[in-house]
Amino acid sequence: MDAVDAPRRPLSERLFADLLEAVLSGRYGPGDRLPPQRALAADAGVTMTSLREALKRLEQMGLIEVRHGAAMRVRDWRRHGGLDVIAHLLLTSGSLDRGVLSDVLEARTLMLGELAALAAQRRSPVQAQGLVALAGEIGRAADDAAAQRLDFAFFEQLAEAADNLVFVLILNSIRELYFAHAERLAVTARHRELAPLYGAAARAVTERDRGGARDAVTRLAALQRQRVEERLG
């Protein structure tokens, strides 16, 4: 589809993105009053319906407080924001924020290591077999892009084996962002060099070796972080 033919984002979505950036960048700081709704709608050239849709999304994210008959106020996103804020912080004004990305990759390494240890303790025989199969598929993947899809499937299976709902939901919440920017988040660049670590992790989980699983996945995630940083230069 040509750029000319690409569907335009709804007005409410564009306004939401503009207001969100204003809050996250500090243009509207914690405790600040937002302009009246009619003024915001007029300045943005949108209907009140579109404005209210945008404001509702910000309120649901915990970033503004809307009270009937009172001024709308900005909340401190560091205190009230959730995982859904990360994606917007990571891609500020369309460009990748290297500081936020570094934090994300650091947290990813820590999370996946503990996820592997739990999986080694709690996995079922079927889940262990699934991890071994996925590790083998990654080694045989035709290219890095195919390996990246398998990588996500491997960690989804690891989360299921860990039997921890929070880890499962975290992966669900980042899936869309992960694949939308897969080329920049090149965690499986030169995937055949990484393949032995998937195999080592799968074997450790199968053998219920918590320490071995944690070490293999931590080393894998650290190397993946290097791949991303190399790609970004």
Protein language model features and the residues they cover:
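C-terminal all-alpha effector/ligand-binding and dimerization domain
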Residues: 155-156, 169-233
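Short, flexible helix-adjacent loops and helix caps
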Residues: 24, 28, 116, 120, ...
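Cytosolic histidine kinase catalytic core of two-component systems
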Residues: 126, 165-166
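Short loop-to-helix capping motifs
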Residues: 37, 163-165, 208-209
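Short linear motifs at protein or domain termini
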Residues: 1-110
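Short amphipathic alpha-helical/adjacent loop interface patches that line ligand
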Residues: 37, 55, 135, 198, ...
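All-alpha effector-binding/dimerization core of bacterial HTH-type transcriptional repressors
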Residues: 79-157, 193-216
